[in-house]
Amino acid sequence: MPTDTKRKAHDQEPTADSSDYDSDGSEEPDFINVDFDFRAPEEIDFQALKRLLQQLFYTHNTKLDLSSLADHVVKTSTTQGVGTTIKIVDDEDQDPYAFVSAITLSSEKKEGSEAANSLSKYLLEVTSKPSSKSVHDVIKSAASSTSTNAPVIAVLHERMVNMPPQVAPPLYKMLLEEVQASLVSTSATRPSHYLFFSRVFSADAFSDDEAMDEDDDDDDDEPSGLAGARKRKAKLARREAKKAGAKKDAPKSRTISDGMALAGSSDEELGLFHPEDIAISKFASNSLTYRFPPPPDASDSFEAPLFGRIALVPADKMDALLQQIETDLSMPAPQ
């Protein structure tokens, strides 16, 4: 049985403050110290885990049994010691800001397999087109109830957008250690691949013409409430992209913390919510990116198109992947 509190991580998160300027007018970022508590998922986290899963699968969330998946995260922690949530120290009763867990894909119909069945069915559905056959075949052969092939373990991870990306390396490292320990203790077959699922967004949605039109709009015409906030946020993002040289001149490997978060993909530039996706894509043997259907209020809320991304990383590449993520997202040395 896992202990309640796993580890603590000390991090620094920048915050904007209008008073943070020196005498020559340049801005000096302010920092607040935040102690993160890496904890085992608990029953109290169930609803928050469902919300994070809903965020992860976006408009496809209705295709999955989110309750079974959230329940799996809690039970896997209790029975196998696998999985972690992140909370603020001394705020343990509040909702987690992030979670990570693992689930072995399976189509076997038995009690307790609802989460694995739901996720496997969804992944097989979205990879069913001929263009995604390589991804589909790996998942299908591993999830089949009659298969003798090595399994595929899906990594479930989501975090709040404003979480510093430096929380990712310890989360993934702990998860891999826990999964490997669980495999040894249960004498289970080692996986052939780890499957990573994430969201990305369309940077192409913010065209230069749209940016110019938005900048010329009268602010009094902006909608109020949440729709207005989203429109102002989109306008700010477009302005920042123009300052960086617009889309055609912007680097294609930036992350969301840099503004538009561009990553080259086919004819469309895609932005990353999780910067570690760059390393995951690098080590993936197979991958697929597909578009989510827009929500009903997408046109009113000026919401950019979102995509789902599946990446299959061979199990023997996981150690190297974790080292790369740690290198990419390491905290800068204190001044």
Swiss-Prot record:
What InterPro entries does this protein map onto? BCP1_family
Localization (cell): Cytoplasm; Nucleus
A GO cellular component annotation here is: nucleus
Compositional bias annotation for Basic and acidic residues: 1-13, 237-252
Q: Where is this region: Disordered?
A: 1-32, 210-259
Keywords from the UniProt entry: Cytoplasm, Nucleus, Protein transport, Transport
Q: Which Pfam families does the UniProt record give?
A: BCCIP
This protein is called: Protein BCP1
Q: Which organism is it from?
A: Mycosarcoma maydis
